[in-house]
């Protein structure tokens, strides 16, 4: 499999340190509110990557964190008159509901930042002892950016350019606490009304960037195979993670980096001020969760993706085509007699090959979806004339592919009541006798009972309304 490595800006063969075992870290949410549709993109994209690696027979150690200590959480708690911990616990639960609704597998480990304070302090000590960090006069601890000659290698930004052109960095030069405006906090001295922990530098709390470094090192080791997140995290978050991790550990932090693109709404950047800000829950309440997952797979993960109502409705319609196809397969397989055409077997193998080729090409989910619909077309054309073995091969390929994409998870098998079966048989007899009035009346009765009947070449096909 080839992936685009942000570090080298090129596609590379994705080779783990240990053959058959991938160690992956994905930056998770800061749980101060419901996640928006932009937050859902990395959640779905990298869950799909994990599913594909596992489908190909690999073991994946997948760590995705919960940021439960942050300025935004503190502010939210102050606004609500409650504690940061209560805010974090409430919105972590809501995040987990959304993640489950989107059919994202649970991470191997889902660590919380507040549960890793000692591990964070261990890295801070390593950085101070090695001269890469220093304690300011107020008890803040800052990473000394100029001590790392490789700083900027992920974002491809030069330190001189940052210092001269970044007003934000210059404004962070607070009362001469920092040696350099580019230096960033790995530990923040306590402020009144904020949560704090004991440390050798006085009461305080961790900086944002070092939380991920500590959780990654604790659960995946000093060097991981892949680090993932949104493109907005490349600088400063991921750049700072690399600097502090490699300076503390003395080795490479992550061998590969993958970053997903942004979500726009009606071709505009999503923002509350433009009133085009949608949470996952907002969209799911109208369309369900599965169309959101499908939507995220319709474009290459590195490309911008434009959210519109028309597109999400189109995604819902595409999913209905998949569900209808699978129902038709079940119906064809339920028959007692089958035809003789074996060609659907080869079509199933062809779809599987196309799917894997697409996924091996930097997680090309649009082409992967195209492979699914190629198979749908063949199933719809050939199912009536196929052998049982060919139908089973098609069903197996269809289920494998859609499972890797995380789709078709709302599929249900409805038990047909005896009364409904009896009515279907009576309707078939009425049609055979050309008693159309009775046949139509029975169809209407079935509809009232919540069942749709479709006449096919293989006989009447039932589905739950």
Question: What do these predicted ranges mean?
Answer:
Residues 269-270, 277-465:
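Structural preference for alpha-helix termini/caps and helix-kink/transition segments
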Residues 58, 132, 451:
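Short phosphate-binding/catalytic loops that engage adenosine nucleotides
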Residues 8-13, 17-105, 458-462:
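N-terminal, positively charged nucleic-acid-binding surface of large information/translation enzymes
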Residues 1-32, 47, 97, 118-330:
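Alpha-helical recognition segments enriched in aromatics with Gly/Pro capping
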Residues 78-84, 108-114, 230:
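The substrate-binding groove and active-site-proximal loops of carbohydrate-active enzymes
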Residues 66-70, 92-95, 105-120, 138-147:
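Short, glycine/charge-rich beta-strand/loop segments that flank catalytic centers
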